Amino acid sequence: MARVLNVEIPNHKRIVIALCSIFGIGKSLATEIVEKTAKLQEEKFGKKFPILTENTKVKEINEEVLQVIRDVAKTYKTEGDLHREVQSNIKRLIEIKCYRGIRHRKGLPVRGQVTQKNARTRKGPRKTIMAKKDKGK
């Protein structure tokens, strides 16, 4: 398996799909990375290696081209940096006590969804309340 941005990407998949296994890279960004890599590859190596396309499988890519992919992918915010940024944004919302921050703190849906009947994913499993037994009868 090839390693890009400290993530093992699957060998048997196309490069665009394999790059999507990295947090923060979707299909459009993966396509953009492949296009930039193809341009850089042509400048650096010329016709030495087959030109990278969206349909190229990861196992068909040699180490030099993989290094170019790593360099291009490094320019984007992914994995740990992106996780940290998202968490700091949520922490900021909680600290300023805005509506979204309060919803995050309470563990309720943030984006205006109705919670009367649904929202079980965000609220967690139902908590049943025990009925009191009558004493003295």
Curated annotation (Swiss-Prot):
Gene Ontology molecular function, alphabetical: rRNA binding; structural constituent of ribosome; tRNA binding
Record bears the keyword Transit peptide: no
GO CC terms in record: cytosol; small ribosomal subunit
Spans annotated as Disordered: 114-137
GO biological process, one term: translation
Keywords: Ribonucleoprotein, Ribosomal protein, RNA-binding, rRNA-binding, tRNA-binding
Start-end of Basic residues biased regions: 119-130
SUPFAM superfamilies: S13-like H2TH domain (SSF46946)
UniProt similarity note: Belongs to the universal ribosomal protein uS13 family.
Function recorded in the entry: Located at the top of the head of the 30S subunit, it contacts several helices of the 16S rRNA. In the 70S ribosome it contacts the 23S rRNA (bridge B1a) and protein L5 of the 50S subunit (bridge B1b), connecting the 2 subunits; these bridges are implicated in subunit movement. Contacts the tRNAs in the A and P-sites.
Complex formation: Part of the 30S ribosomal subunit. Forms a loose heterodimer with protein S19. Forms two bridges to the 50S subunit in the 70S ribosome.
Record-given protein name: Small ribosomal subunit protein uS13
